[in-house]
Swiss-Prot record:
GO CC annotations, alphabetized: cytoplasm; ribonucleoprotein complex; ribosome
Gene from which this protein is expressed: rpmJ
This protein's name: Large ribosomal subunit protein bL36
Any GO BP: translation
Lineage summary: Bacteria, Pseudomonadati, Pseudomonadota, Alphaproteobacteria, Magnetococcales
Recorded superkingdom: Bacteria
NCBIfam families: rpmJ_bact (TIGR01022)
MF term (GO), any: structural constituent of ribosome
Amino acid sequence: MKVRASVKSICKDCKVIRRNGSVRVICKNPRHKQRQG
């Protein structure tokens, strides 16, 4: 899980979603998981 100021989708499988007011990226590649912090 990377915590970043700006979350971007890295590959075509990444999905940017809002969960409980925080922006997250979920992907089948676990290295691409991010959240805004």
